Amino acid sequence: MPTINETAFIAPNATIIGDVEIGDETGIWFGCVIRGDVHEIRIGSRTNIQDLTMVHVAKGKFGTYIGDDVTIGHSAIIHACTLEDRSFVGMGATVMDGCVIEQGGMLGANALLSPGKRIPAGELWAGVPARKVRDLTQEEIEFFKVSADRYADLAQEYVTSIPKDLGKDS
């Protein structure tokens, strides 16, 4: 059974299944699927998982661990991997089994991070398959926290203003 902090925003058409824990002020946006059916998923605080993203696990091998203040762009696939605090995954990107994106690391839009790869702190990776493009500037790394803050604030607006039964059958 999922464990969801009461301050998290879960869009009415998001699906959360199985052994999932979601931290405070986190936003799980419209059309997301968070599927901890065969292993655990842990999502930290003030993280935003944007519209149409799929988060899954690998049976008997890898859970999925997403830290605090993480931004995951629209339509990403996050599969059996670790995203450390204040990491960033661009729209449409795929992170595969056993991968790690370290704190302050970034995977660009539409990139494919192959199984077992690690993006070190402060690096931007992009492409198919993803490779290091360059080091991030301090300003870019600081923006990850700004992005997380903006989405956490938006999640709180939804939590306080959207009826709890929105989108549910009567």
Where on the chain are the PLM-derived regions?
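Short proline/glycine- and basic residue-enriched helix-capping loop/turn segments at helix->loop/beta transitions
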Residues: T71
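N-terminal segments that cap or nucleate solenoid repeat domains
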Residues: M1-I28
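Glycine-rich hexapeptide-repeat left-handed beta-helix
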Residues: M1-T3, D37-A58, F62-I66, H74-S170
